[in-house]
């Protein structure tokens, strides 16, 4: 019979259109976790979502003339194991760019 030690885990999912801003945010989060003696795993790259929009170029007749636009949503996953109260406080005070969407699960 094995005894499992209950580990506390924080899972952080990040989404952004700009990959560089996303990577900088991941680096800040991991650096903050390392300074507070928590174990950070990641950033784990998740699949990039591509959304393509097809738009008619002319306002009237020419349906053959179309233009395509796309948005790419880059995603990353970070797991923080054994966070202390200092870790959570430091993550709450962290200043991240406005173009990065963050989901936190305990």
UniProtKB/Swiss-Prot annotation:
The keyword Transmembrane does not apply. GO terms for molecular function: structural constituent of ribosome; tRNA binding. GO terms for cellular component: ribonucleoprotein complex; ribosome. InterPro entries: Ribosomal_uS10, Ribosomal_uS10_dom, Ribosomal_uS10_dom_sf. Keywords: Ribonucleoprotein, Ribosomal protein. The keyword Ribosomal protein applies. One of its GO terms (biological process) is translation. Involved in the binding of tRNA to the ribosomes. Part of the 30S ribosomal subunit. Belongs to the universal ribosomal protein uS10 family. HAMAP family: Ribosomal_uS10. This is Small ribosomal subunit protein uS10. The gene is rpsJ.
């Amino acid at each position: 019979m094995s005894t499992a030690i209950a580990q506390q885990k924080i899972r952080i999912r990040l989404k952004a259109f700009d990959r560089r801003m996303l990577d900088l945010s991941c680096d800040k989060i991991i650096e903050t976790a390392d300074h507070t003696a928590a174990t950070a795993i990641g950033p784990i790259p998740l699949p990039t979502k591509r959304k393509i929009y097809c738009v008619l170029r002319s306002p009237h007749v020419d349906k053959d003339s179309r233009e395509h636009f796309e948005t790419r949503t880059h995603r990353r996953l970070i797991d923080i194991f054994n966070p202390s109260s200092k870790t959570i406080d430091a993550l709450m005070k962290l200043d991240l760019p406005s173009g990065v969407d963050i989901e936190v699960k305990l």
